[in-house]
């Protein structure tokens, strides 16, 4: 009887596959999940003297698994974990054990904060290295003995003071709660790290201020956080965050403290003087002076009307009489995502040429945006300044902690700013002179400088 050729081929393939499988089992039999565990020392004395300070565990797993290494004190069966359910890929591993385990407290001990890592107490231990397969939950373990010799176990470094101020942080360079100061007091020498945990779980390191204490010394250390806006970066999104301080001593003991920080109204402020497609970006015109415009430290005088004649947008040089008003007008846009803070005097305010903003009680304020005018004969930078917008264009916010009211131009909004300077000083060697506008972020930067430069000539009054 003759078998069909196809059936013969199929039978041959099946037999070949069976032989291959059998051969694999003979040549390379299935390996256990935990292939081997070795420990280099049976006794350690973790006192940093360089003699038997640590032991080395070597182990191999044949499949991806969760690995734990725990030390069980024989006196009371208390467990001290070195590793707990840590994910490992198949392969060989070497790990050094210096006696430092997961944090714990002994009876009658207290510590401000949480203990992350601490030296294990001296005594007799049974170690257990256990693995659990990631694919089918198969488990294996191996045990051994370890003696730990040493003196009294010190506490990890403590941060006996840890403060975060203010708890609500508005990183928008408006001069109000723009920075967070973190104060930490270490009770002994330790490496100190402070960081913010963002909403993705990432650590954002916070820089230590260089003061009297050196890094790592016991004592007070200060950390300064501004959200990145100082380097022109966008701060983290608004929300609740955690500030963490970790202290670690030379033998690896560590503790941490945490505090909550709320970020709100954050964002890099961005504004500009709006360029005009036709005509002057900065309108300059002249007007006669009236005594009602006079302003002083005690009161702002009458406000001059905003220039609104279409012919005022020309780019021609200005010729004006001594004692008349040089009137300007321009538009500012907040094109950022956060409001910008501004302060007076209001648009329409008239300055005498020798007056400064401070002469009207309007002192420089960190974080405030103002429009300024400067001329070549000005003795200081942008001596004449105005708020960006009239009160009805701005949003007023009162700080409940001090009852101060602050004014903001909302994101995406524009405001027209205008005002005047009474030109009273003719300097023959600087006549005509140029005058121009700028957008000032006080104590931060002048973002738009030398905008709308125009030649101004003074002539004697008739």
Task: Show where each model-derived region lies.
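Hydrophobic membrane-insertion alpha-helices, especially the h-region
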Residues: 8-25
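Short loop/turn motifs at secondary-structure boundaries
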Residues: 26-302, 307-308
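Short, hydrophobic/aromatic beta-strand segments
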Residues: 67-71, 81, 192-196, 338-375, ...
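Solvent-exposed, conformationally flexible loop/turn segments
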Residues: 90, 218, 319-325, 409-416
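Enriched for extracellular/lumenal, surface-exposed ectodomains of secreted and cell-surface proteins
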Residues: 130-135, 246-248, 405, 437-445
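Asparagine-centered strand-capping/turn motif at beta-strand->loop junctions
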Residues: 331-339
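Intrinsically disordered, low-complexity Pro/Gly/Ser/Thr-rich segments with frequent PxxP/GP/PP motifs
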Residues: 383-427
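Terminal connector regions
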Residues: 425-459
């Amino acid at each position: 009887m003759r078998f069909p050729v196809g059936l013969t081929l199929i039978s041959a393939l099946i037999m070949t596959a069976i032989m291959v499988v059998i051969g694999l089992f003979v040549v390379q039999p299935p390996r256990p999940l935990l292939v081997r565990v070795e420990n280099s020392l049976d006794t350690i004395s973790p006192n940093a003297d360089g003699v038997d300070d640590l032991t080395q565990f070597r182990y191999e797993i044949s499949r991806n698994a969760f690995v734990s290494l725990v030390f069980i004190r024989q006196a009371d069966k208390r467990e001290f974990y070195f590793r707990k359910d840590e994910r490992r890929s198949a392969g060989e591993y070497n790990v050094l054990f210096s006696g430092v385990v997961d944090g714990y407290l002994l009876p009658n001990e207290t510590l401000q904060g949480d203990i992350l890592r601490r030296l294990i107490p001296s005594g007799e231990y049974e170690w257990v290295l256990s693995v659990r397969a990631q694919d089918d939950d198969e488990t294996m373990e191996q045990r051994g003995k370890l003696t730990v010799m040493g003196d009294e176990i010190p506490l990890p470094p403590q941060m006996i003071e840890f403060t975060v101020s203010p708890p609500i942080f508005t990183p928008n360079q408006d001069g109000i709660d723009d920075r967070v100061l973190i104060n930490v007091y270490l009770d002994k020498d330790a490496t100190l790290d402070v960081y913010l945990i963002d909403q993705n779980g990432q650590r954002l390191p916070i820089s230590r201020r260089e003061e009297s204490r050196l890094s790592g010394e016991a004592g007070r250390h200060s950390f300064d956080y501004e959200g990145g806006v100082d380097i022109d970066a966008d701060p983290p999104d608004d929300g609740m965050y955690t500030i963490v301080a970790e202290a670690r001593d030379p033998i690896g003991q560590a503790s941490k403290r945490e505090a909550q920080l709320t970020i709100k109204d954050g964002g890099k402020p961005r504004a500009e003087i709006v360029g005009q497609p036709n005509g002057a970006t900065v309108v300059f015109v002249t007007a006669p002076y009236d005594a009602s415009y006079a302003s002083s430290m005690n009161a702002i005088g009458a406000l001059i009307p905003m220039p609104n004649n279409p012919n005022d947008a020309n780019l021609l040089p200005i010729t004006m009489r001594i004692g008349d008003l040089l009137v300007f007008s321009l538009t500012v846009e907040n094109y950022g995502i956060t409001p910008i803070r501004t302060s007076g005097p209001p648009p329409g305010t008239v300055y005498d040429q020798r007056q400064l903003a401070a002469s009207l009680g309007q002192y420089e304020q960190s974080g405030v945006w103002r429009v300024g005018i400067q001329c070549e004969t000005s003795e200081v930078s942008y001596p004449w300044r105005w708020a960006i917008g009239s009160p009805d264009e701005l949003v007023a916010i009162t700080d409940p902690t001090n009852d101060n009211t602050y004014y903001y131009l909302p994101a995406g909004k524009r405001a027209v700013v205008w005002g005047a300077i009474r030109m009273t000083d003719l300097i023959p060697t600087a006549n005509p002179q140029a005058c121009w506008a700028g957008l000032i972020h006080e104590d931060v930067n002048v973002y738009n400088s030398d905008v709308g430069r125009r030649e101004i000539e003074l002539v004697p009054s008739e």
